[in-house]
Amino acid sequence: MKKSSKTNWINMNEVSGFLLYSAYFAWKRKIEGTLLPHDLTHVQFILLMTLGFLKKDKAYVSQNDLAKFLCFDVTMTSQVLRALEKRGLLKRSQKEGDERSKFSELTDAGLAKIQGAAKDLLKAEESFFVSLGENKQGFDEHLRGILQQ
C-alpha cells in the first residue's frame, strides 16, 4: 500500500475495504432507486424474498430464522416485518404452544409485490455489474469465499 509522499496518507484507492465500501454504496443507491417505484426499501425486499425462499423448505419460518439467515438484528427484523404486515404483504402468526415465536408467511399481495420488484432488481443488478463481463462468475465466487471466512 503506497503512501503519498507529501502527506504520508494512505492512498484510499488501494485499500480493498474502502473500495468494497464505496462499491457497496454505489450498488445500494442503484437498488434503492429501482425499488422506490415498488414502494419497498431494500431491507423490506430482502426480507420478503428471503421469506419466500425459506418457505420452500420449511413449514414455518420464524423471525429468528429470517434474522439468522440474513445476519440481521432480531429487533430490526421484527419491526420491519410488523410494518410489512400492516401493509398486507405478509401475515404473522404464532404456532400453538410457542407464544414467543412469530412465524411469517407471504400474502398474495406480498408475492405479487416481490415478483414485480424482482424483475426490475435483476435488470438493475445486470446493469450495475455489466463491466465485469465474463469475470462476473469469478467475482461471485470470490464474494462467496469471503463470506465463508
What are these regions (language model features)?
Residues 1-9, 58, 134-149:
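C-terminal regulatory/oligomerization modules of transcriptional regulators
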Residues 63, 81-82:
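Short, hydrophobic-biased segments on the C-terminal half of alpha helices
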